[in-house]
Amino acid sequence: MTTPPADDMGTTPFRSLSADLAICDLPKLEQYQEGGPRITLLRDDGVARVVVFHFRAGQQLPEHQTSSRIYVQVLRGMLTFRTAGASTNAPAGSLLALEANVAHSVVALTDCTMLLTLTPSPLRHSLPEMQP
């Protein structure tokens, strides 16, 4: 298997270690911004989209949905993840799974880093998706 090149959305923060292995140093990407979370596309190879979010406490993603199944991993801090049917406070180390086409929102309770994986990549769907 060959590591896919940077996708059409820009350069990748991955560093190639060999023809089939690449690494991304997530702590080096940690940056915040005022007015909303900092969103960095890590990779979109058509199979999955991987995005990292850096939130300041109180920042949020308002209710939205995507045509992909999502996995949300809280790497640092704590956030609240809400759907119409449930709400949970997710601390660092939590992994949340959500089916496609389910409206949800996110609020950072503390400064927080969240890794989002969408599968398959929204590039394979016709529905609009959240753009990083």
Question: Which positions does each model-derived feature cover?
Answer:
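Glycine- and acidic-residue-biased ligand/ion/polar-headgroup-sensing regions
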Residues: 68-84
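Short, charged, intrinsically disordered terminal tails
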Residues: 122-132
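A short, N-terminal "cap"/entry segment at the start of jelly-roll beta-barrel domains
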Residues: 1-47, 130-132
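Short beta-strand His + acidic residue motifs that chelate non-heme Fe in jelly-roll/DSBH
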Residues: 61-63, 81-82, 98, 103-109
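Conserved short histidine dyad/triad with adjacent acidic residue
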Residues: 34-36, 46-66, 100
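Short acidic-glycine-tyrosine-enriched beta hairpin
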Residues: 84-100
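A cytosolic small-molecule/anion-sensing beta-strand core signal
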Residues: 75-76, 91-92, 110
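Ligand-binding loop in jelly-roll beta-barrel domains
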Residues: 100-124
